[in-house]
């Protein structure tokens, strides 16, 4: 399966059978910042934004004072799983990032998708990739 198929079929899919419940954007990005696959709506990000995200995985709490920035959008960092998951909130939407051995799985959402639904979709694919040694 291509990386694009993982994004299209496992991240940008209907959530829990609701056609109107989909992530607004998603991507799989290598630890080096190279995009493996992304939705058409995934924001252009700056290298320093990706560096900040990677630093937070290695040094949990790094982004808390400044917020998580992606594509120029600032998210307030909320409780995640140290070294494994970063979660951010902005208004009625947010972001979930799951770290695997070689990649970061991104999901961005807004209402009617809930934070829990975004977490489920992103972390399910991330856990699968971890099981595959990726």
UniProtKB/Swiss-Prot annotation:
| Cysteines engaged in disulfide bonds, as pairs | 13-118
Organism per entry: Olea europaea
Coiled-coil stretches noted in the UniProt entry, renumbered to this chain: none
Q: Any extra detail in the entry?
A: The variability of the residues taking part of IgE-binding epitopes might be responsible of the difference in cross-reactivity among olive pollen cultivars, and between distantly related pollen species, leading to a variable range of allergy reactions among atopic patients.
Q: Which InterPro entries match?
A: PFN, PFN_euk, PFN_sf, Profilin_CS
Domain of life, per the record? Eukaryota
Tell me yes or no: is Disulfide bond among this UniProt entry's keywords.
Answer: yes
Query: Per its UniProt record, what Pfam families does this chain match?
Result: Profilin
| Predominant location | cytoplasm
* Molecular-function GO terms, alphabetical: actin monomer binding
What is this protein's record name? Profilin-4
Name the PANTHER family on file.
Answer: PROFILIN, PROFILIN-5
Biological role: Binds to actin and affects the structure of the cytoskeleton. At high concentrations, profilin prevents the polymerization of actin, whereas it enhances it at low concentrations.
Protein location: Cytoplasm, Cytoskeleton
**Listed GO CC annotations:** cell cortex; cytoskeleton
According to the UniProt record, list the residues that bear Phosphothreonine: 114
Keywords carried by this UniProt record: Actin-binding, Allergen, Cytoplasm, Cytoskeleton, Disulfide bond, Phosphoprotein
Homology family: Belongs to the profilin family.
